[in-house]
Amino acid sequence: MGRLISVSFGLLVVFLSLSGTGADQDCLPGWSSHEGHCYKVFNLDKTWEDAEKFCTEQANSGHLVSIDSKKEANFVAELVSQNIKETRRTDFVWIGLRAEDKRQHCSSEWSDGSSINYQNWIEAESKKCLGLEKQTRYRKWVNLNCGQPYRFTCEI
């Protein structure tokens, strides 16, 4: 009886260690998991508005990516670098931040409604939408014309 309990306990430990946290299982096929969120780079050229709309159609809580820490910024940069297909339009990738008023100031939140807790600007210009720039290995944010079509990353 003692041996059966020992074997059962051993199998339980193995099962739990193999199952992990389950974070990867929560993501849709083709999406990448990072700290409880799922991300996917789309090799489609869309304006900022159309990219945001596309992301919201992927899942209930989908939006253009919001970057809340240097760790997340590095994860997103690597994901974009590994998944972007090279074309003329790959110099920039949309993120979920844009100016919301006529003075071109950024809103106080990302397109998903979360607060801006981390910033990594290259420069301030008079354009309204923000993206990641290839020249910085997709690690810096740059102001872009919202009507230009670029690739994008969604987060759910």
UniProtKB/Swiss-Prot annotation:
Q: Name one GO cellular component term.
A: extracellular region
Q: Which InterPro entries match?
A: C-type_lectin-like (IPR001304), C-type_lectin-like/link_sf (IPR016186), C-type_lectin/snaclec_domain (IPR050111), C-type_lectin_CS (IPR018378), CTDL_fold (IPR016187)
Per its UniProt record, what Pfam families does this chain match? Answer: Lectin_C (PF00059)
Disulphide bridges in this chain? 27-38, 55-154, 129-146
What the entry lists under SMART domains is as follows: CLECT
Q: What Gene Ontology molecular function terms does this protein carry?
A: toxin activity
Q: Give the function comment from the record.
A: Interferes with one step of hemostasis (modulation of platelet aggregation, or coagulation cascade, for example).
Q: How does it assemble?
A: Heterodimer; disulfide-linked.
The further comment given in this record reads: Shows greater sequence similarity to the alpha than beta subunits compared to other heterodimer snaclecs.
Q: Which protein family is named in the record?
A: Belongs to the snaclec family.
Which named protein is this?
Answer: Snaclec A2
